[in-house]
């Protein structure tokens, strides 16, 4: 036999001594496989102590287990074996304690074909392609990023304000980025 790859042509030479014998060539198909896991990442300014939960995947022969991650520690789930041609339905992230509405959650995978990137939505899927089995492990990472807003303090003076009036507004506290103290004289708006 000139080779053992059943996906290319091979030549079998039958010798004179094999004449009349039953010769059997067996082709064995082995499904391509790799390992797969879910992972959790937290962006800067995530609230320490928030706990995100990812339920098990569905749709695979070997589904992932539940993954819990406490901010702000990145966490990798347990590896499972997956096969080319499978499609994993990825779980929607939940949170307790903490408020999921305070975060955006994106999901990204380093191999395969991902459909959907909102980690808070159900129905995102990952198709395990034959090419994806070259990556080991395939990792789908859910990343939480705190939502932000702009806080601006302002002082406006009414129509009957005196030019001799003044006001000072102190700095805010307790935020990641706090405002600073500012003062203004009567009749002059400030922010």
Task: Give short role names for the model-derived ranges.
Residues 10-12, 23-25, 75-80, 124-126, ...:
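Short strand-edge motifs at loop-to-beta-strand transitions and within beta-strands
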Residues 49-58, 105, 164-173:
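Short, surface-exposed beta-strand/strand-loop-strand elements in extracellular ectodomains
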Residues 56-95, 170-191:
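Tryptophan-paired
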Residues 32, 38-51, 147, 153-166:
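Structural motif
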Residues 1-29, 151, 168-191:
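Low-complexity/repetitive intrinsically disordered segments
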Residues 1-8, 85-121:
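Surface-exposed interfaces of beta-sheet-rich extracellular modules
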Residues 4, 15-17, 26, 39-41, ...:
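Tandem-repeat architecture and repeat-register "anchor" residues
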Residues 14-34, 40, 128-149, 155:
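Conserved "repeat-terminator" motif of extracellular CCP/Sushi domains
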């Amino acid at each position: 036999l000139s080779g053992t790859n059943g996906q290319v042509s091979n030549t079998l030479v039958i010798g004179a001594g094999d004449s009349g014998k039953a010769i059997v060539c067996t082709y064995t198909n082995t499904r391509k496989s790799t390992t797969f896991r879910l992972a959790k990442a937290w962006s800067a300014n995530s609230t320490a102590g928030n706990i995100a939960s990812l339920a098990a995947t569905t749709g695979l022969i070997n589904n992932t287990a539940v993954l819990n991650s406490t901010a702000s520690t990145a966490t990798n789930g347990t590896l499972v074996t997956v096969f080319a041609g499978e499609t994993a339905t990825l779980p929607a992230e939940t949170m307790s304690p903490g408020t999921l509405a305070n975060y955006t959650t994106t999901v990204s995978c380093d191999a395969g074909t991902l459909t959907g990137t909102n980690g808070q939505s159900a129905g995102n899927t990952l198709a395990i392609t034959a090419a994806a089995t070259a990556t080991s492990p395939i990792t789908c990472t859910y990343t939480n990023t705190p939502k932000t807003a702009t806080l601006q303090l302002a002082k406006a003076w009414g129509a009957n304000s005196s030019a001799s009036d003044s006001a000072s507004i102190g700095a805010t506290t307790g935020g990641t980025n706090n405002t600073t103290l500012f003062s203004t004289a009567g009749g002059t708006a400030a922010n």
